[in-house]
A protein has these predicted regions:
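N-terminal secretory signal peptides that target proteins for export/translocation
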Residues: 1-3
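Structured, helix-rich domain cores that form ligand/interaction pockets
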Residues: 5, 9-441, 450-515
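Residues in the recognition helix of alpha-helical DNA-binding motifs
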Residues: 447
């Protein structure tokens, strides 16, 4: 018995000795105190965020917009927009306004949509109004409006719709056109969630086919290979885009990074505690690189800045230096080290139901007496007031995921816990409590850093193409680049600056960016 306790004591003392000797090479992020852990890694589990992400609506007039119309008001309207189209052909967007719209930033361009919508009135990052001055049939809508994602998420759907309708009403009043009907054209219902942190397992085809109850006959999966023989299921779709309803499930975090737009989503997820401060750091830095494959490198960058173990910080810096100088690195080794030192990035999935007019026109909506005061736009208000009922229909009759163990008849099975949480998500159409300026400043700073990186790379490339391979200082390269420009280049630059400045929202860029 004494020998037994002696052996245990020996093992215990050896463990203490090894901890003292090698403990400094442990995962030091894991050894931080609870307060530090909460600061960097706290997030709410299994959280959902719902909103209408895309909203198209169409407007038709009582007036005759056919090619051989005799309506004088339509002829005046057509003449004015034909003049704008001829002027805009020099590739410079034009300021545009009508009485009552002086407080709105509006620009005209002759962008084409669907063949015959050849005029576009835009409010940067808010909406685009596509106008057909000639329609092929008398049942074709003369105007199609696209409401952008940013105001829909940050200001609310009704507020964004009413803001765009100010322009429609101003056009109607100024040109004496009578609005006949305003109706929905396409609406996307989206659920952002951090519920699934291993979507490639949960949504694996053999699991999905057992869980799904739907009218879809086909499904499309897209995978991407990852380091260390792992793979990533980043896109699933059911149906076709031209169908009444098209369903997508994909990695929203990856889309934001690779597409290089909508960086304000990162802020939105952070303020709703769907991602941690660590995730916020990684996504913000990764956005500037616009390359998803550098995810593990940014995780190492985080540790090199905030980790406490000098041995591992040096290893992190070595990998980053190797990538910066050689352009290549062993991503398998990088991935293993990142997994050892820091948590994996929180994945945000987007579950999206894209509905089109061919399906929504048959919906039996509850008509609200209070919406009669809105006149020709009553259909839109009724549709938005039926939002909960429509989303319940989409997430049950169009597609639902069920627990096959809950009933012998699959059609009677209860929802999976994941699907229950999705259907319980709150649907509140109000402006967000987080000041919009925070989102604007955050997005602008990320885009500024992205543009600066591109500018530096382009400036060096221009110098090498112009002067050949040289050892000049970078400052000299920049000076020489300016000397290469002629009058035509300066004129083209001024035209582009004018055009680009009109494409940006003036509220987002009214002041100099603060460092």
């Amino acid at each position: 018995m004494a020998k037994k306790y002696s052996s245990v004591l020996t093992i215990f003392l050896c463990a203490i000795f090894l901890t003292c000797v090698f403990g400094h090479r442990g995962i030091s992020m894991a050894s931080q105190n609870t307060e530090q852990k909460n600061n960097w890694f706290f997030r709410k589990e299994k959280k959902f965020l719902h909103n209408i992400d895309t909203f198209y609506y169409s407007v038709s007039f009582c007036n005759d917009f056919l090619k051989d119309t005799e309506d004088e008001n339509v002829k005046t309207f057509r003449k004015d927009f034909d003049k704008l189209a001829a002027t805009e052909s020099i590739d410079i967007n034009l300021d545009w306004s009508l009485p009552g719209l002086e407080d709105m930033q509006l620009i005209y361009s002759n962008r084409s949509f669907a063949g015959y919508y050849n005029n576009c009135i835009s409010c940067p990052e808010r909406f685009d109004i596509f106008i057909a001055t000639r329609t092929p049939t008398d049942i074709t809508s003369e105007i199609l409006v696209q409401l952008r994602s940013k105001p829909l998420w940050l200001q609310g759907v009704v507020s964004t719709f009413e803001y765009s309708m100010r322009v429609i009403n101003a056009i109607s009043k100024y040109y004496h056109l009578q609005i006949h009907e305003v109706k929905e054209n396409r609406i996307d219902y989206c659920w952002h969630t951090n519920y699934l942190q291993s979507p490639e397992k949960y949504l694996r085809i053999d699991n999905f086919v057992q869980m799904q109850v739907s009218r879809f006959k086909r499904i499309n999966y897209q995978y991407q290979f990852k380091p260390n023989n792992e793979y990533e299921n980043d896109y699933i779709s059911l149906g076709r885009r031209s169908d009444k309803c098209f369903v997508r499930m994909y990695l929203k975090t990856k889309e934001v990074i690779e597409q290089g737009y909508k960086p304000w989503f990162i802020n939105e997820w952070f303020y709703n505690q769907m991602i941690s401060r660590f995730d916020y750091y990684v996504l913000s830095n990764l956005y500037e690189l616009r390359n998803w494959k550098y995810l593990d490198i940014i995780r190492l960058q985080f540790y090199s800045e905030y980790g406490s173990d000098e041995f591992y910080r040096t290893k992190c810096n070595d990998y980053m230096h190797e990538l910066a100088t050689k352009g290549v690195v062993n991503f398998d080794s990088v991935n293993k080290l990142a997994d050892k030192l820091v948590p994996r990035l929180t994945v945000i999935m987007n579950i999206e139901f894209r509905t089109t007019r061919k399906g929504t026109k048959s919906y039996c909506l509850i008509e609200y007496e209070r919406n009669k005061k809105y006149g020709v736009t009553k259909r839109i208000y009724d549709y938005l007031d039926n939002r909960r009922m429509i989303s319940d229909y989409l997430t049950h009759d169009t597609l639902r995921l069920v627990d096959i163990n809950s009933d012998s008849n699959k059609s009677r099975c209860d929802y999976t816990n994941f699907w229950k949480s999705l259907r319980r998500t709150k649907q509140i159409d109000v402006a967000k409590c987080v000041p919009e300026k925070l989102h604007r400043d955050y997005s602008r700073k990320l885009d500024y850093n992205l543009m600066k990186r591109r500018y530096i790379h382009s400036a060096i490339s221009l110098s090498l193409y112009g002067k050949g391979i040289n050892n000049d200082e970078v400052e000299q390269d920049l000076i020489d680049n300016l000397a290469m420009l002629n009058d035509n280049d300066i004129h083209a630059a001024m035209n582009y600056k004018y055009k680009r400045s009109h494409q940006l929202n003036s509220e987002d860029f009214e002041n100099k960016l603060e460092d």
